[in-house]
C-alpha cells in the first residue's frame, strides 16, 4: 500500500493541469484532506524552485504530488515543419502572423537533470509522470530521494510495464479524461478504453495501488470507482472550476455548458492527443491532423495562434481542456469541491 494514499483523509487527488493552476490550488486541496498536485511541465528551473519553496513554506508538511512529463523531445525535418505550417497558414494570415512569431520551443519541458536537482532538494512526497517513466538512472535517483513514484497508464499493457519498471502507484486513465493522454506504448485511439472497463482490468493485472482517472465529476463516480477496486480517484476538470484555479472565465463557462459529445481528443494544440472542448480550430483542422508535428513541437506554432487570438478577445484557438464529465462539474472553493466529490464515502 502507498504510505501517501494511506495518510490522506480523503482518497482523492487533484490532477496536475499545466497552465490551469499555480501553488494556490494544490495547497487548498491539501488543506482539505486530499492530495494536491503541482504541474511542473511548464516551469523552467527558477520558477519551479520558487513554486516548490512556496509548497514547502505554506504546505504545513502536508503531502503533495509534483508532476512531470517523461517524454523524449523528438526531431522534425523541414518537410514535416512545412506540412504543419501549411495547415496553419490560413489562420496565421487571418491574424496577421508570420513564421517569425513562432517561439523557439513548444513550452513543455521533459523531466531532466535540472528538475531532478530541485526534486532532490525539496523531496516532494509524490512524484508522478505522464508518458511513461524517465530514464532508469534518473528514476533511481527520484526513488533514492524518498519520493513515491506514480505514473499514468491507458492500457493494461502500460500498467504492467509501469509495475515492472519501478512505479509505486498506477493511475488508470480512462478515455473520458480531459487533457493529455498519458499513453506511451500503444497510441492507437481504437485500443483505448473507458475508465470503468480499464479500471477493474488494471486492478486485476497489477499488484500495486491503482488510482482511477477520467470523467470523475461527482460523488457517484467516485463511489463507483472505489467499488471497482480503485485505491483512490483523480479528478481534473472538477478542479478547473475551483476558486483557486487560474482557469479563464471563457473556459469556465464552456465547462459548465459542455455535454459529453462536446469534447474530443485532438493533437492540434501540442502534437499530443488531448481531450478538450471542441472549438473552431478543432472543427476545421482536426480534431486529429496527421500533419501536426509530434509532441510537443506542434505547440509552438499553435501557441502563437492562441496568444494573438486571445489578445483580440477570441478563443477559437484556445485549448479548453475538459473531460467528458465536464457538464457535471460545479464551481466553488477547492475545499467545497473535495467535500462534494467525497460526499458518498
Regions found by a protein language model. Name each.
Residues 1-205:
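Active-site entrance/lid segments in N-terminal catalytic domains of soluble metabolic enzymes
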Residues 180-185, 189-211, 216-345:
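Conserved active-site-proximal phosphate/metal-binding subdomains
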Amino acid at each position: 500500500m502507498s504510505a501517501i494514499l494511506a495518510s490522506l483523509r480523503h482518497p482523492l487527488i487533484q490532477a496536475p493541469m499545466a497552465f490551469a493552476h499555480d501553488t494556490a490550488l494544490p495547497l487548498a486541496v491539501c488543506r482539505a484532506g486530499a492530495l494536491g498536485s503541482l504541474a511542473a511541465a511548464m516551469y523552467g528551473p527558477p520558477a519551479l524552485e520558487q513554486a516548490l519553496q512556496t509548497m514547502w513554506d505554506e504546505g504545513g508538511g502536508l503531502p503533495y504530488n509534483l508532476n512531470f512529463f517523461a517524454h523524449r523531445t523528438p526531431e522534425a525535418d523541414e518537410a514535416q515543419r512545412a506540412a504543419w505550417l501549411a495547415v496553419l497558414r490560413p489562420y496565421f494570415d487571418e491574424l496577421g502572423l508570420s513564421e517569425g512569431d513562432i517561439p523557439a520551443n513548444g513550452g513543455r519541458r521533459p523531466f531532466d537533470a535540472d528538475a531532478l536537482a530541485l526534486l532532490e532538494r525539496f523531496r516532494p512526497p509524490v512524484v508522478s509522470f505522464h508518458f511513461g517513466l524517465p530514464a532508469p538512472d534518473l528514476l533511481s535517483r527520484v526513488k533514492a530521494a524518498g519520493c513515491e513514484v506514480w505514473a499514468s497508464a491507458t492500457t493494461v499493457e502500460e500498467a504492467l510495464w509501469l509495475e515492472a519498471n519501478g512505479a509505486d502507484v498506477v493511475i488508470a486513465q480512462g478515455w473520458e479524461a480531459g487533457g493529455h493522454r498519458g499513453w506511451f506504448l500503444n497510441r492507437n485511439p481504437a485500443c483505448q478504453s473507458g475508465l470503468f472497463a480499464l479500471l477493474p482490468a488494471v486492478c486485476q493485472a497489477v499488484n500495486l495501488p491503482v488510482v482511477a482517472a477520467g470523467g470523475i465529476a461527482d460523488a457517484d463516480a467516485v463511489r463507483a470507482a472505489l467499488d471497482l477496486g480503485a485505491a483512490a480517484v483523480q479528478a481534473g476538470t472538477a478542479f478547473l472550476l475551483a476558486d483557486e484555479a487560474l482557469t479563464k472565465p471563457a473556459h469556465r463557462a464552456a465547462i459548465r455548458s459542455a455535454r459529453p459529445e462536446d469534447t474530443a481528443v485532438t493533437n492540434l494544440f501540442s502534437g499530443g492527443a488531448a481531450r478538450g472542448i471542441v472549438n473552431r480550430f478543432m472543427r476545421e483542422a482536426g480534431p486529429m491532423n496527421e500533419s501536426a508535428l509530434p509532441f510537443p513541437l506542434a505547440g509552438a506554432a499553435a501557441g502563437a495562434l492562441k496568444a494573438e487570438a486571445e489578445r483580440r478577445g477570441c478563443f477559437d484557438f484556445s485549448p479548453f481542456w475538459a473531460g467528458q464529465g465536464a457538464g457535471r462539474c460545479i464551481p466553488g472553493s477547492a475545499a467545497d469541491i473535495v467535500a462534494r466529490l467525497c460526499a458518498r464515502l
